[in-house]
Amino acid sequence: MTLIDFFSKDQFAASAGVRLTCVREGYAEAEMLIGPQVLNASGCVQGGALFTLADLAFAAAVNTHGPLTVSVNSHIAFFSSAREGTLHATARELVDHRRLPYGEVRITDDEGRLIALFTSSGYRKSNATIEVDSLM
C-alpha cells in the first residue's frame, strides 16, 4: 500500500472530490475539481471545502516519515474566490521536528492565482505509525 492509498480512505475528503496527486518526503500535491457539492449559497467554493483540500495535502506531507502525525493547530487565510475549474494544493513541511512538524499549503486555481494559504502544526504520535510500502 502507498501513502496515497492510505489517504484515499479519507471518506470526507473523497466526498468533497479531493485527491492526492503527488507525495514525496515532506511534500504533497492534491487537487479538487470544483462541483456543486463544494459551492456555498453565493456560488463560490465554500471555505470548509478549501480547508479540507489543504488539510489532506498537509496530512500527506507530514506523514511521509512513518509516525502517524495529526494536526493540532491550523489557520487558513482566503485571498480570492473560485467558482469553476480545478483547485490545486501544494503542501510543504517547513519544520521536520521529531514531535511537532509545521507546514504550509498554498491553494491555487488553474491560472495559478492564490486562492488560500493554510498553515498547520502537527503532532507525531509515539504509539502509532502508518505502514506503507512506498509514498506513491
State the predicted function of each range:
Residues M1-M136:
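Terminal targeting signals and extreme-terminal segments of soluble enzymes
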